[in-house]
Amino acid sequence: MLAFPNAKIHISKRGWIHFHTTHKHPHDGRDTSIPPQILAELVGKSWDRVVLLEDEETIAPGLRTWWSGGHHRASIAVEVDTKNGTAVLSDTFFVMENVLNNHPIGITENMYECMTAHARALKSPIIIPLYDPKNFDRFKDGVVA
């Protein structure tokens, strides 16, 4: 973020509120969620670049986000229109099997939100689980579309 001084910074509004109103959380440490130097930048000189995302947002033509929940309060899905159809990626599903088997990730806040996100992701022809090493097999040379 600091390397791109002209970029807008899009953050889940739900996640932002959760971050600022939760004092103890079993797997979201404040300093690991948003390191102090980044937080200072976000609420300081970069605040005018921060966009707090509603549950459904269109960022630009062909680029949308939706709140997916499941993993944590800041989890979102990003949809990108490509020549091969819509691609969706999210941290609510780590590997493809999470989506295909409707099996929530191991560290989840709400398994029902995960299952809802899986069902919605399955509507897209291209699913990109963020942490799946098989993405390199699915997408030759790392090219999605």
Located regions from the model:
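Active-site metal-binding motif and surrounding structural segment of the metallo-beta-lactamase
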Residues: 1-11
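Residues that flank catalytic or metal-binding motifs in active/ligand-binding sites
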Residues: 5, 46, 74
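Metallo-beta-lactamase
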Residues: 10-67, 109-125
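A generic "binding-loop/recognition-motif" signal
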Residues: 15, 72, 133
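Well-ordered beta-strand positions
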Residues: 58, 69, 79-81
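Active-site glycine- and acidic-residue-rich loops that bind
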Residues: 64-76
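Cap/insert and terminal regions of metallo-dependent hydrolase folds
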Residues: 75-145
